[in-house]
From Swiss-Prot:
The lineage of its organism: Bacteria, Pseudomonadati, Campylobacterota, Epsilonproteobacteria, Campylobacterales. It comes from Sulfurimonas denitrificans (strain ATCC 33889 / DSM 1251) (Thiomicrospira denitrificans (strain ATCC 33889 / DSM 1251)). It comes from the Bacteria. Belongs to the endoribonuclease YbeY family. This is Endoribonuclease YbeY. Gene3D superfamilies: Metalloproteases ('zincins'), catalytic domain. Single strand-specific metallo-endoribonuclease involved in late-stage 70S ribosome quality control and in maturation of the 3' terminus of the 16S rRNA. Its main location: cytoplasm.
Amino acid sequence: MIDFDNRTSLNLHIEVIEQIASSLTNKEIELIVTDKDEMREINSAHRNIDKATDVLSFPYIEMPLSPLGSIVICSLHVEEKSKEFGHTLNDEFALLFIHGLLHLLGYDHEVDSGEMREEEARIIKEFNLPQSLIVRSEG
């Protein structure tokens, strides 16, 4: 289940997000979409990086019946990247969600041997989405 908090004026749909989440976990996920200023504040407070970023994940402590964690997505990145890559806002939203969800599930593309990239590619293909965040970042 997705607990969706859209703090922006973007018209985003979570049907595909719900399907992606339920294909990978049965735990609740908090999903927040916010503006670049709040994202910068969150990034600064939790990572000591004083700039906005596209997506952040915050896993919760593993306990029975506890939610998996929170994913925060920056609306500006959704808008800019969807225009840059020529796909819909909802496609970009889904790509960022997948990236954040995989981090909640323990994947880390900065240290793994390509497992996160492979899993991202599998999910993207399954849900017929455009090119992945990791592939774009490596290009």
